[in-house]
């Protein structure tokens, strides 16, 4: 069984006669759903319906299709793994920008559920990266908006405060210390070791080599 969709949305699919049943595929506009060794022969049609009726970006629609497959019984061998790869429609030559999602769940009792959680976390980190780029370009307000989006997707406990910590560091580096302090404090509330780590950043060039500044940041984290 093989399926291909090119960048223009053209599809080519083949399900061979020796694929283990239930096996089959369905092709739609710009997509293909295929499966083999399924418990029921309703899986690929259910995937297609879910994909077409769902909203959101490509990752969200693919997850909807996977969930629909599981609802029809999924793989007759049971559940174990799931994966998703999504790349930008137009490449920049910079892999870290073009590969939007590249996630795998190798062994889990609920692989699609776990993959869905990881996609949500990746969305948060994608928003963090966008915020960093805005701040680096001097568009701090746009950066703050992206950071808020990121932290709404990833609660502090989901990252042990790391997302909030690096937001704070980026704002300190941009000279926005008062705005950085609440984020750093959020990180500290999750794990007090963030106060130790911030003191190590000047040696790596990530913050100014200013002991008074570091002392102030640590003090504000601990308030």
Where are these regions (language model features)?
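N-terminal nucleophile
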Residues: 1-126, 137, 158
């Amino acid at each position: 069984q093989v399926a291909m969709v090119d960048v223009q949305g053209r599809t080519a699919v083949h399900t061979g006669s020796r694929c283990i049943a239930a096996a089959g595929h369905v092709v739609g506009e710009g997509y293909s759903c295929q499966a083999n060794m399924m418990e029921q022969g309703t899986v690929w049609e259910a995937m297609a319906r879910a994909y077409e009726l769902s909203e959101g970006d490509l990752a969200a629609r693919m997850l909807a299709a996977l969930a629909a497959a599981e609802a029809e019984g999924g793989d007759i061998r049971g559940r174990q793994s799931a994966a998703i790869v999504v790349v930008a429609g137009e490449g920049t030559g910079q892999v870290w920008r073009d590969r939007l999602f590249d996630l795998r769940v190798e062994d889990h009792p609920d692989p699609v559920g776990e993959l869905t959680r990881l996609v949500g976390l990746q969305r948060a980190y994608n928003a963090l990266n966008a915020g960093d780029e805005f701040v680096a370009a001097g568009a701090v307000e746009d950066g703050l908006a992206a950071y808020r989006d990121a932290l709404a997707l990833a609660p502090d406990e989901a990252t042990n405060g790391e997302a909030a910590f690096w937001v704070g560091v980026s704002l300190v580096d941009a000279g926005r210390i008062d705005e950085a302090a609440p984020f750093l404090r959020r990180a500290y509330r999750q794990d007090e070791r963030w106060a130790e780590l911030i003191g190590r950043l000047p040696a790596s060039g990530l913050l100014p080599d200013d002991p008074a500044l570091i002392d102030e940041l640590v003090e504000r984290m601990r308030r």
